[in-house]
Amino acid sequence: MAAEDTSVSGVSGRYATALFELARDQKAVDEVKADLDRFEALLGESADLKRLVRSPVFAADAQSRALTAVLDKVGIAGISANFLKVLTANRRLFVVADVIRAYRALVAKFKGEATADVTVAEALSDKNLDALKVALKSVTGKDVALNVKVDPSIIGGLVVKLGSRMVDGSLRTKLNSIKHAMKEAG
């Protein structure tokens, strides 16, 4: 069972595991991942969709109709669409972001990859992304998939989370360390 091999837990982990096992059985793991990535991107772009997903105020049937319209418009169908509709019918659509993260972890485990969450101040070039993947592969011994998030508040550098390890090489952290040291000295 996939759930025994990975660290997904809770409601989102159970849903992600069920989706992963169905996708694996239907040989659609990558297709479902691509659909979920598209849905997550839509969530990031649309405040209305984010509100629909997170708010308990919407009636289940209204939420279901709206979700169906969105899925039809962006071309998400099959297993992915049915899964999102099940989440909606069960009033669990609010956990979709956690389900997507857990699904990605299951896919990475299935493919023998590690997944690193990388936060940068500005978007990295393809050359820099490849160099980062090579460096992380030398540390882990596995291919590394990157989830890159741009956060200008870190000022510069990057923060890498890989499993239970985290390396914070951000300029914000370095400046805060200097500030703290100056307070201690003064």
Swiss-Prot record:
Superkingdom per UniProt: Bacteria
GO-annotated biological processes: proton motive force-driven ATP synthesis
Keyword S-adenosyl-L-methionine: no
Record Gene3D superfamilies: N-terminal domain of the delta subunit of the F1F0-ATP synthase (1.10.520.20)
SUPFAM superfamilies: N-terminal domain of the delta subunit of the F1F0-ATP synthase (SSF47928)
GO molecular function: proton-transporting ATP synthase activity, rotational mechanism
GO cellular component, one term: plasma membrane
Mode of membrane association: Peripheral membrane protein
Stored InterPro entries: ATP_synth_OSCP/delta_N_sf (IPR026015), ATPase_OSCP/d_CS (IPR020781), ATPase_OSCP/dsu (IPR000711)
Keyword field: ATP synthesis, Cell inner membrane, Cell membrane, CF(1), Hydrogen ion transport, Ion transport, Membrane, Transport
Keyword Membrane attached: yes
Subcellular location: Cell inner membrane
PROSITE patterns named among the record's database cross-references: ATPASE_DELTA (PS00389)
Pfam (any one): OSCP
Residue pairs linked by disulfide bridges in the UniProt entry: none
Family: Belongs to the ATPase delta chain family.
HAMAP family reported for this sequence: ATP_synth_delta_bact
PANTHER family in alphabetical order: ATP SYNTHASE DELTA CHAIN (PTHR11910)
Function: F(1)F(0) ATP synthase produces ATP from ADP in the presence of a proton or sodium gradient. F-type ATPases consist of two structural domains, F(1) containing the extramembraneous catalytic core and F(0) containing the membrane proton channel, linked together by a central stalk and a peripheral stalk. During catalysis, ATP synthesis in the catalytic domain of F(1) is coupled via a rotary mechanism of the central stalk subunits to proton translocation.
Summary of subunit composition and partner proteins: F-type ATPases have 2 components, F(1) - the catalytic core - and F(0) - the membrane proton channel. F(1) has five subunits: alpha(3), beta(3), gamma(1), delta(1), epsilon(1). F(0) has three main subunits: a(1), b(2) and c(10-14). The alpha and beta chains form an alternating ring which encloses part of the gamma chain. F(1) is attached to F(0) by a central stalk formed by the gamma and epsilon chains, while a peripheral stalk is formed by the delta and b chains.
Name used for this protein in its record: ATP synthase subunit delta
UniProt organism field: Bradyrhizobium diazoefficiens (strain JCM 10833 / BCRC 13528 / IAM 13628 / NBRC 14792 / USDA 110)
Organism lineage: Bacteria, Pseudomonadati, Pseudomonadota, Alphaproteobacteria, Hyphomicrobiales
